[in-house]
């Protein structure tokens, strides 16, 4: 298992970025794919038309999102934490993704950089 941490700058305020990460209609705007998302803890989510699935664990509006990402029946859980920091250019998103299966690590990192945050950065450019 591996962990990944990185900061991503976005040119939008934290409250706006939070909405873009937690509301299905907003997610669909920057991904171009079907999304199922709730801002309630203990709910399932699906992104990129089911390519990413998991469970929402914790929300602190405008500040923090914690999710369990599913990789089959993997144990321990793969946890994604997004902390939104105000930044002079908008928001700096602190991503921490723990317990990534070794065989999925490179694909996950590429997905974060190109698909997930790459799409968000392009959306806000």
Regions found by a protein language model. Name each.
Residues 1-36:
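Hydrophobic ligand-binding cavity/cleft-lining segments
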Residues 5, 33, 44, 96, ...:
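Conserved short-loop catalytic and cofactor-binding motifs
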Residues 21, 31, 60, 69, ...:
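Short, flexible helix/strand-to-coil boundary loops that buttress conserved ligand/catalytic motifs
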Residues 28, 36-39, 43-100:
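Hydrophobic-ligand binding "helix-grip"
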Residues 99-125:
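A conserved amphipathic terminal alpha-helix motif
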């Amino acid at each position: 298992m591996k962990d990944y941490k990185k900061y991503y700058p976005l040119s939008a305020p934290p409250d706006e970025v939070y909405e873009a990460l937690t509301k299905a209609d907003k997610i669909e705007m920057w991904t171009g794919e079907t999304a199922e998302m709730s801002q309630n803890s203990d709910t399932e989510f699906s992104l990129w038309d089911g390519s990413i699935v998991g469970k929402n664990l914790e929300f602190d509006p405008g500040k923090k999102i914690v999710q369990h990402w599913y990789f089959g029946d993997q144990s321990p859980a793969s946890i994604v934490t997004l902390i939104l920091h105000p930044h002079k250019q908008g928001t700096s998103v602190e991503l921490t993704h723990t317990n990534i299966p070794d065989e999925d690590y490179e694909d996950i990192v590429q997905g974060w950089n190109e698909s997930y945050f790459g799409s968000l950065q392009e959306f806000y450019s």
